Amino acid sequence: MKPGIKISKRYSARNASVITVLLLLIYLIYINKETIQTKYQGSRINHDSGGDSTKDKTHTFTIKEIHFRPLDEKTQSYGSLQVTPEFVNMAKSEFEQNVAVASGDNEDLYDKQLWSASIKSNPWTHQFTLKQGSIKMKRMVNRDPDYVESFLDYAHENPEMARKVHLDWVDESVLAPNVTDKETVISLALMSSNAYVRLPYEGDWRNLSDWNNDLNPDLSVGIGWDSDGVRGHIFSNDDSSVIVIALKGTSAQGLPGSGEDETTDNDKLNDNVLFSCCCARVSYLWKTACDCYVKSYTCDEKCLEQELVRKDRYYQAVLDIYRSVVTAHPNSAIWITGHSLGGALASLLGRTFGAPAVAFEAPGELLATKRLHLPMPPGLPAYQEGVWHIGHTADPIFMGTCNGASSSCSIAGYAMETSCHSGKVCVYDVVTDKGWHVNMLNHRIHTVIDGILTDYDTVAKCKTPDACHDCFNWNYVKGRDVPKKHKSSSSTASSTSAETSTLTVGPSPPEKTTTSCIGRNWIGICTEYGI
């Protein structure tokens, strides 16, 4: 027999064996496809999905960590503080001491401490009860912070191209707080209130920054506490299967009941960038919060978008807080809450990563959502929203009526010009039901808890907000080059003729002198002029 024929038969036998093995593998994969698919989906999606078996389960939460992300990371490190028994005793003693000092005026105490007068327990030892539910949500398949933030960076550099990027979306059942349960809503509001409570300056802060202090020996860098930063209080249930992030809201001297601390100036700056039409350019009397104003009712849109994502702005800070929490709890369901500015940031953060978020008395954040180019699934139905805005009709900040030169917000230096919310709104009509008057004092978190949430027998019904459009009278341009309006040929000719006759008849008119105001009193009247 020829050698070539032996080789051919040997290869044929080997090929037949390989084909047999492949067919066997394909058969095994086919009969076990459901098991393989389940394991694959479990590895690529966070373990916050739940079915009917987990519905209406009640959890008890306590505060576990405090995160503080500074705005200037060159002089301060991002740190976290573990809430240990030693810290609780120290914080509890300080809070009780403040209560004793202010025992003659409890209302003033709670204005400063931002803790409900109806809750007798200490904010550092209180146990929060939340009932979970299962909701249908449409969100991105890949919600890893690295992937999401890289997409956002690309969207800000190339917004037109980013709209053409095909993102993978998934419909799934997600664990979420049951906002139809009264005790759950009150507990979330108390968590938001807890984020305002002043911290003792002492504590064993842990460095979460990515840089090594040994490489920067000339920098006097502290960890955890600074005058400029964002604070997030982290709550966990017994088995850490559910984590709640409560973001601190606005502290301001001009907003009663919002507390006063070191973050006041930056809180106002971020409020004015997030919730104004253009850098808080309310009138010529105002100093703008950024340099995007072009001329009357004209604003540089690209400049505004870049302002929102600066590293020293609050949105970037809460992205870092979320990243740290998810890294520490990769298999936990993450819920987010907050009051006022903290509520708006909670909504933006929940929208970014597809996490359930409950906001209390937040200003309208739909405009900021669009400017940040947050991922929005096409044709998202209202029932698949995971963002809830809880508020009442006597709060002008939540209702979007705290604007205008004579408003309380404007007098305090806040340009709250937005009124449109994303997600769903749950509104208590206290003006009709209780006869309340619209007043900025009603924006206080403990007023909401004590006067509304605990007083009503049922929670407000959540619904999709009506169609809304903020800043409709503003013109937004891409870049500083504003297109000039072209005049007709007849008007141009008449203008040229007028200029020629002016130059040939008699002496030229005297030059006009312009004056500018270089000093104003506290109500805006000019008291000193300069040439």
From Swiss-Prot:
Q: Name the residues that span the membrane.
A: 12-31
Q: Does the keyword Iron-sulfur apply?
A: no
Which domain of life does this protein belong to?
Eukaryota
Which Gene3D superfamilies does the record associate with it? alpha/beta hydrolase
The protein's Enzyme Commission number: 3.1.1.3
Can you cite a GO biological process for this protein? piecemeal microautophagy of the nucleus
> What is the reaction catalyzed?
a triacylglycerol + H2O = a diacylglycerol + a fatty acid + H(+)
Molecular functions (GO terms): phospholipase activity; triacylglycerol lipase activity
Q: What is its main location?
A: membrane
User: Which stretches are Lumenal in the membrane topology?
Assistant: 32-531
Localization, UniProt: Endosome, Multivesicular body membrane; Prevacuolar compartment membrane
Q: Which residues lie on this side of the membrane: Cytoplasmic?
A: 1-11
- Biased composition (Low complexity) is annotated at 489-502
The reply on keyword Membrane is yes
Which terms in the GO cellular component ontology are assigned? Answer: multivesicular body membrane; vacuolar lumen
**SUPFAM superfamilies documented for this protein:** alpha/beta-Hydrolases (SSF53474)
Q: Where is this region: Disordered?
A: 482-513
Bilayer topology reads: Single-pass type II membrane protein
Q: Which UniProt keywords apply?
A: Autophagy, Endosome, Glycoprotein, Hydrolase, Lipid degradation, Lipid metabolism, Membrane, Signal-anchor, Transmembrane, Transmembrane helix
Q: Do you know which InterPro entries this protein is assigned to?
A: AB_hydrolase_fold, ATG15_Lipase, Fungal_lipase-type
Protein family (similarity comment): Belongs to the AB hydrolase superfamily. Lipase family.
PANTHER family annotated for this entry? Answer: LIPASE ATG15-RELATED
Protein function: Lipase which is essential for lysis of subvacuolar cytoplasm to vacuole targeted bodies and intravacuolar autophagic bodies. Involved in the lysis of intravacuolar multivesicular body (MVB) vesicles. The intravacuolar membrane disintegration by ATG15 is critical to life span extension.
What does the record note on quaternary structure?
Binds to both phosphatidylinositol (PI) and phosphatidylinositol 3,5-bisphosphate (PIP2).
Name the record gives this protein: Putative lipase ATG15
Organism, scientific name: Kluyveromyces lactis (strain ATCC 8585 / CBS 2359 / DSM 70799 / NBRC 1267 / NRRL Y-1140 / WM37) (Yeast)
Record gene name: ATG15
